[in-house]
């Protein structure tokens, strides 16, 4: 559907942003046995849940809920990131807004890449510069925490696809959404 919309964080998708639309479509059309999708739960957003259930019908066993790290799980998730994840013996990288203070997550989490705060123009005007940037981020057996709004889906798809081509199948790329915003930005952006 080619219409202008603005999301909860103020990112506006214009009708002429065909690069964004194509890259988002590629990310949802991608299929691999180890590639999972997170969708809204029925109680949070019934129309979107139904849309994604239909869209992902062929890989429904690879679908989970995108609110896995929020609501009643948010405190557990934040505690895991801030303390327990230090013991994983894996590199953990953060990809997110240039305004996020990722150092508050702990010195065991490294910065992989920043995204302009409203990165839609970046992807609209310079999609290949963005793709070149992500293609240099391949550490074996690493965990990538991605909090880049709607660009997270595109970044994760690209990292996973290129990682597989490099036989780097053991890395995990996780869209953490806004689940750590109160730490990264010192403010609550959602009511979990």
Task: Spell out what each predicted region is.
Residues 19-23, 123-137, 151-153:
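A short, acidic, amphipathic alpha-helical segment used as a generic capping/interface helix at domain edges
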Residues 41, 112-115, 177:
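Residues at the C-termini of beta-strands that transition into short coil/loop
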Residues 48-50, 103-105, 152-160, 184-187:
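A short acidic (Asp/Glu
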Residues 85-133:
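Redox- and metal-dependent alpha/beta enzyme cores, enriched for Fe-S-associated oxidoreductases
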Residues 91, 142-143:
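Structural motif
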């Amino acid at each position: 559907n080619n219409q202008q919309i603005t999301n909860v964080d103020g990112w506006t998708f214009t009708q002429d942003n065909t690069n964004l639309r194509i890259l988002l479509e590629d990310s949802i059309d991608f299929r691999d046995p180890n590639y999972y999708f997170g969708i809204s739960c029925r109680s949070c957003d019934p129309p979107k849940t139904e849309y994604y259930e239909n869209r992902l019908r062929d890989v429904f066993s690879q679908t989970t809920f995108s609110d896995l790290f929020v609501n009643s799980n948010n405190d557990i998730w934040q505690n895991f990131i801030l303390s327990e994840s230090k013991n994983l013996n894996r590199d953990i990288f953060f990809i997110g807004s240039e305004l996020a203070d990722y150092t508050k997550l702990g010195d065991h989490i490294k910065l992989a890449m920043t995204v302009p705060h409203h990165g839609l123009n970046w992807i609209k005007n310079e999609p290949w510069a963005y793709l070149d940037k992500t293609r240099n981020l391949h550490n074996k057996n690493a965990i990538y925490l991605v909090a880049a709004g709607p660009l997270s889906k595109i970044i994760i798809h690209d990292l996973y696809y290129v990682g597989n081509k490099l036989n780097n199948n053991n890395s995990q790329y996780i869209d953490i959404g806004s689940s750590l915003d109160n730490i990264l930005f010192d403010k609550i952006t959602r009511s979990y």
